[in-house]
Amino acid sequence: MMKTFVKKILLLLGSAAVFCAGTPLQVLAAEAGGEAAGMVPLALCIPFAGLLLCIAALPLVRAEWWEKHQIHAVAFWSLLFIIPFAVMYGSGMALETVLECLVGDYLTFIVLLFGLFCVSGNIAMEGDLAGSPRINVGLLLLGTSLSSWIGTTGASMLMVRPVIKMNYWRRRKSHIMIFFIFLISNIGGSLSPIGDPPLLMGFMRGVPFFWSLHLLPIMVLNVAVLLFVFYWLDRRAYRKDIAEGCKPDISKPGTEVKILGLHNLIFLVMIVAAVILSGVLPGMAAFQDEAGQVLGIRLYGEVKLSYPALIEIVMILLAAWLSFKTTNSEIRRKNHFTWGAIEEVAVLFIGIFITMQPALMILKAKGAQLGITEPYQMFWVTGALSSFLDNTPTYLVFLTTAGSLGFTSGIATTLGQVPVAMLEAISCGAVFMGANTYIGNAPNFMVKSISDENGIRMPSFFGYILWSLIFLVPVFLLDMLVFFL
């Protein structure tokens, strides 16, 4: 199954490369490329919108077809962007744009997800513990606390199977996984650069490592409100389940819990260390050339795989391999481990990363012209765009914008002085509002896919957004009133 999947991905990439190579080459200078990026027509964003519409609608109207032909839909929309882009700006720029997106962003993204998926799949829990409202609140609080220190993806992959297993007997449980995404996969990652990639990028641009702890009061407010709402929802659902005869098959609720495969925590720490190194090594002289550029393997044009990224990839893949080699396959069987979830995410996100390039180009070119000068504006605009685009470049665009406004006090970054309130707003917008959609942050879709595989009926793409509008947006309005006005 994995071999077939890899062949399909390589076929998709090969098709794009062959097209770009076969188009009459119109080599653009770096300056011209930047100018062209600023003039990208809005129509080139249509493939991105089309792919999102497929992700949202086809599982509802043609579920069987969608399951079999996701890779073809991704290839169609990707080529629908690449071909016109190559015709308009030359195959050289098209190939460079696609490679930069795949090597610079997608590769490390999917390798990190793959590593965490493998390691967490080798940790299992068994014992007499049933998912009651109090236990579920405790699990969500534990996962949220871990998110800032092992990353939202790490915490999500570590906690998702135990939460599902404890609530296997429940009939009404989709709300549990939705709040799991809200809290563990997003909001919990706001207290350190390890927590979420935008904060890691901020650290690489001069934001102090522990500065993110300034976000603690904001995070505590969000977590407290959402856990209170969750407890109320879960208690109602729990009582209905019990009234309908649903009961956990355990003799001593809340006791005798056993965790299998605990040695895999070593490999989890190894992956976290790889992520930290990817943020620290580029700033070291040993990894820079005379011009201060990060050293790496040049692939095409200005595209290169940096040595820090290569070290990160090797460390993560080694951790995944060691995890499989040292763990009994019986543990994976207990976890109902399959490759389906990671395959789905890998296929869909390769298309998302490629087709969202025009939107990111327009944002980078026009971001400073939006007239956004107040913290509350930064919070909402950064958050709204992070809900659908990659939150890391979105964060960097608005951090750059804030640094160019000429402030003389605040946090000293390599992009300029950024007032504390402005930086808090940008950080919270990028991290918190990744929870607004399934594609807003890396773990969201993984949690959905694993939940679906385990028989939990998760809401559709638009159905999930409705949950966000009802439960998250009011909390974000409260954030604005309390912290950003």
Where are these regions (language model features)?
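Transmembrane alpha-helix boundary signature
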Residues: 25-31, 60-64, 82-105, 114-131, ...
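Interfacial loop-to-helix junctions that mark the boundaries of transmembrane helices
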Residues: 32-44, 65-74, 95-107, 209-218, ...
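Hydrophobic mid-bilayer segments of alpha-helices in multi-pass membrane transport proteins
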Residues: 43-55, 69-86, 106-115, 260-270, ...
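Membrane-interfacial helix-loop connectors
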Residues: 84-86, 147, 158-172, 176-178, ...
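Juxtamembrane and boundary regions of transmembrane helices in multi-pass small-molecule transporters
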Residues: 172, 191-192, 210-259, 432-485
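Core mid-bundle transmembrane helix pairs that form the ion/substrate translocation pathway
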Residues: 212-326, 482
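Transmembrane helical segments that form the transport core of multi-pass membrane transport proteins
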Residues: 270-405
